[in-house]
Amino acid sequence: MSFSPLIRQLIDALRTLPGVGQKTAQRMALQLLERDRSGGVRLAQALSLAMEGVGHCRQCRTLTEQELCPQCADTRRDDTQLCVVEGPMDVYAVEQTGYRGRYFVLKGHLSPLDGLGPDAIGVPQLMARIEEQGSFTEVILATNPTVEGEATAHYIAQLLAEKGLVASRIAHGVPLGGELELVDGGTLAHAFAGRKPISL
């Protein structure tokens, strides 16, 4: 079946979403056009507003509509702990554990094969934040328990050790190869409670 140019454009746009292939994108497009045009209009408006109105927090780099996210703007949070995560979804996952410290969001993990080195994911900005804040006594490395996440945590731990700072790693109650955003709050809370210093 050959789709019109506008329908093809909609299908291609839907395929940019994670986990959405050609067939799923076709079903979504046809569902919106055939059965839920008002839902499609709401989706387009919400997407347009979010793309224009959502940016990154100037301190932790998570997604927010303000200059500072709610976590960074909250003066009651613990200024001695900094939790380093790979992405904004991980902040939401860690918040479910009751963690009350500060955050820093990397833009992924180290992956030399994909051209992602320390500069690409924001390690220099992380180190600058730690130096500027000056109050962190513990940096919790909550990168995903994947090979790349472990390598990222180890690299950052080495940089912190050179500055005499304590780095800890969340415990492995989180399944190896898993991603934080997919882990339930209880498992993640257990992993946080069992975190251990990284030995170099």
Curated annotation (Swiss-Prot):
Start and end of every Toprim domain? 80-175
Q: State the protein's name.
A: Recombination protein RecR
User: What does the sequence similarity comment in the record state about its family?
Assistant: Belongs to the RecR family.
Gene3D superfamilies xrefs: 3.40.1360.10, 6.10.250.240, RecR Domain 1
SMART domains tied to this protein: TOPRIM
Query: Which cysteines does the record link by disulfide bonds?
Result: none
Show the SUPFAM superfamilies listed in the entry: Recombination protein RecR
- Which NCBIfam families does the annotation name? recR
InterPro entries, alphabetically? DNA_Rcmb_RecR, Rcmb_RecR, Rcmb_RecR_Znf, TOPRIM_dom, TOPRIM_RecR
Q: Which GO terms describe its biological process?
A: DNA recombination; DNA repair
Per its UniProt record, what PROSITE patterns does this chain match?
A: RECR, TOPRIM
